[in-house]
Amino acid sequence: MLELASAVGGVDVLWLETRDAIEELKAAVDAIKDFGLPICATMSFDTAGKTMMGITPANLAKRSQELGLIGFGANCGVGAPDLLATITDISRHVSDGTNVISKANCGIPEYREGKIVYTGTKELMAQYVHLALNSGAKIVGGCCGTSFEHIRAMRKAMDEHQMNGTPSLMDIESKVGEMSAGSKAIFAGNDSAPIKVRRSRRGR
C-alpha cells in the first residue's frame, strides 16, 4: 500500500502519531523505514505531562533523534495548555533548527445535545499558534476537533507571527487556559514529580 501511495501520490514524508510507548514508536519506524522516505512522529501526553506509558518529553526527544526522525513532537492530549508544556520541554533537549511538531486538540471535548463538541475557538487556536512557535515548534497544526475555520485562523496567525521569546506559564494560561499540575511540573523542568490522577484523553 505504501509503495502504491508513493508511486501514485508522490508521498514526501511518512507520519506516525498518537504513540504512547518508545517500543511502539520504534516498531512503527522499523516497519516503514525501508521505504526510504523521511519519517516524522508524535506522541500523546496526558495531564501527568507524560504518555500513558510514562514517557517524558525529554525521553521522546532523545529517542527520536536516535531513530533518525526528521521531525517529532506531540499531538492530541488534553488541549493546548498541556501540549505547550510538552513542546517547551522537548525544545530544551534539542538543538536549534530541530523540527519540533505541535498538534494540539481544539479544546476539550464535551457532550452536548447528543454530540461531541470541542470547546476551542478560532481565537484560542490562533493564540496557540503564536505560543507554540515561541515555545520552539517548527511545525504547528491541530488535532481532534480542528475545523477548516480553525485552520484558516491558525494560518493567518502563522503568517503574522513575530518571534517573542519562550512564553511564561502566565502567558500560556492567560491566553489558552489552565495547565494541569503534571504539565506544570514538566514545564518547570521537573519530569519526576509524582502525579496521582491522569485525565483520560484520546482521539486517534
Show the residue positions of the predicted features.
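Domain-level signal for soluble alpha/beta catalytic cores
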Residues: M1-R204
